[in-house]
Amino acid sequence: AFAKAYPSLSLKFHTASKGRGSQMHAGSQIANGEILYFLHADSFPPQDYDKYIIQAVSQGNPACCFRMRFMSWNWWLIIIGWFTRFSWRASRGGDQSQYITKELYEKIGGYNTEIPIYEDYDLIHRLYDHGTYYVIPKWLKTSARRYEEIGVYKLQWFYITIYWKKRNGATIDEIYEYYLKWCQTSQLQKSSSQN
């Protein structure tokens, strides 16, 4: 569908090792453009997104994302989306998509291919540590499927916990251990509620 919508694009299909960080890094290595754009499969950028990105780069913004709206009328998700207009580090996430010049991507080391979780946040934190981070004032839409399946407040509490664990010095291994325990507990609760 994407190829039909953008026939002028030169698309490459590439297989990489398991893990989102490894896969996105592999894509960056075969890309031949000056700007990299990472987009989750269930996120939909605004019309003319490429023009907004090129304009932002020309104005001296080597890395940024779009504002985000969930495809849901849940009041909490509306609030979360509203806060993505701010350039605060805590308001960032992979669902907002990520553009970065290839030069800056290489300079900060790109996606960490060794970590099994938190790859988007890891890259975003290094971008913030490097300098300013720009939010394009246009709206991207993203699926609320995971929130609907797991529960809005339960999933948001999980994200907040991981964020604060990392901010307080937790290692990726500690965060991953928490993630595995949380997933196991969530699956058990889901199974018991269905019985």
What is the meaning of each model-derived region?
Residues 40-46:
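The conserved acidic donor/metal-binding loop of glycosyltransferases
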Residues 36:
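Short aromatic/hydrophobic "clamp" motif used to bind/position activated sugar donors
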Residues 14-31:
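Glycine-rich, basic loop-to-helix element that forms the pyrophosphate-binding segment
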Residues 63-71, 83-100:
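A recurrent flexible, glycine/aromatic-enriched loop bordering the glycosyltransferase active site
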Residues 129-195:
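Hydrophobic helical membrane-anchoring modules
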